[in-house]
Amino acid sequence: MGEEIQQTHFEQADYDRFQQRLEAETEHLRGLFAQHAFDNDSRMLGYELELCLADDAGNPACNNTEVIAATGNPLFTSELAKFNLEINGNPFPFEGDVFARVATDLYDLFDQAEKAADRCGARVAMFGVFPSVGPEHLEPEGFMTELHRYDQLNNQLLSMRGQPIQLHLEDVFTLEV
């Protein structure tokens, strides 16, 4: 998940403040672990599932924010690509019929996703790698979810790398971008 940001331009002082906050929060978390502040007696099981959105031809449907809004459920969130969304399932105590409860929850949430996608002209699919994604679907313009946090993440990764990212995926087919 993550939170949307409003700011789109950052100075060195912003990066310095971010680093300081990250270090302070990490230290705070270490302290909580050292104090055994977390309830270790009740184990919980949580899950998430990433989904792909396809059009009637099986190509990526780039309307994740529309589908998420149509669910009306905060357990659905966006992913980097406009043709992906994520279910963040409910947590359950790790006891008894926990797997049956997770399955029921997942079926219910998946059904919500299917109905919302259908209302938005898309279909929901579960793929590890979307089989019809090609190089044309990997350009930020047009296929990256239009949230500032994704745009800034992309900009920072490219800036840190100092050169374009090259992908070479080889399996039954080869994709080179």
Please provide the spans of the model-predicted regions:
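Phosphate/nucleotide-binding catalytic core
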Residues: 1-177
